[in-house]
């Protein structure tokens, strides 16, 4: 019995010492990861559009269940079931997928002087943040894409967000009306208008 106890103590100490190693954190760091800055602008746009449309679909399905838009007149209670797997899916898609992709698209468009890509980024941002504030009221907006440095963004007032959504759309109209002087022009990567 004493031997089993000693072996258990030695194993516990060995596991504890190994788990405290700093080299453990290098295990899950991908060696071939691509930095967002090195991705071509025409490869960022489809991701931003897809994340936006997924978020819109998630919001539509959630609201349609509440409003009974997807209900039918069947008498059987098991026939007409439409369930959302997660109630936070819209929020997750907007803040962890759509807005970060749009931020990268905005930065890349600004760096390459691609006015039409920048206009698309502004429209997508207005769509995402506009519907988010419609659904939830005051939401994180100004600090929303600073996740790498700020895990707790402050909530911005809905009126400020609506004012900025209108400004984003006005800016996009101006950018769309100006000639694109960049070599990067939206084409097949624009999943909506191509």
Feature annotation, model-predicted:
Residues 1-30:
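Bacterial Sec-dependent N-terminal signal peptides
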Residues 5, 9-12, 133-135, 185-187:
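A generic structural signal for short, solvent-exposed coil/turn residues
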Residues 6, 12, 39-40, 113, ...:
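Residues at the start of alpha-helices and the adjacent loop-to-helix junctions
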Residues 20-85, 89, 93-96, 100, ...:
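Membrane-proximal, proline-rich intrinsically disordered regions
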Residues 28-33, 143-145, 187:
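Solvent-exposed, flexible loop/coil residues
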Residues 46, 139, 191:
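A broad, low-specificity signal marking well-ordered, structured residues that form hydrophobic/aromatic
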Residues 73-184:
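Conserved, well-structured interaction surfaces
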Residues 186-194:
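Short, intrinsically disordered, charge-balanced linker/junction segments flanking boundaries
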């Amino acid at each position: 019995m004493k031997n089993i106890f000693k072996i258990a103590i030695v194993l516990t100490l060995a596991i504890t010492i190994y788990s405290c190693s700093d080299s453990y954190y290098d295990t899950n760091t991908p060696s071939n990861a691509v930095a967002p800055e090195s991705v071509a602008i025409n490869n960022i746009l489809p991701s931003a559009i897809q994340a936006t449309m997924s978020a819109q679909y998630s919001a539509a399905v959630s609201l349609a269940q509440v409003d009974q838009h997807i209900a039918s007149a069947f008498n059987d209670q098991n026939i007409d079931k439409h369930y959302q797997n997660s109630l936070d899916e819209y929020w997750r898609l907007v803040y962890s997928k759509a807005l970060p992709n749009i931020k990268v698209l905005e930065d890349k468009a600004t760096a390459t002087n691609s006015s039409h890509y920048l206009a698309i980024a502004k429209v997508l941002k207005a769509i995402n943040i506009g519907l988010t504030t419609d659904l939830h009221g005051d939401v994180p907006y100004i600090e929303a894409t600073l996740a790498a440095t700020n895990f707790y963004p402050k909530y911005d007032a809905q009126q400020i967000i609506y004012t900025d959504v209108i400004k984003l759309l006005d800016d996009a109209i101006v950018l769309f009306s100006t000639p694109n002087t960049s070599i990067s022009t939206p084409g097949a990567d624009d999943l909506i208008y191509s």
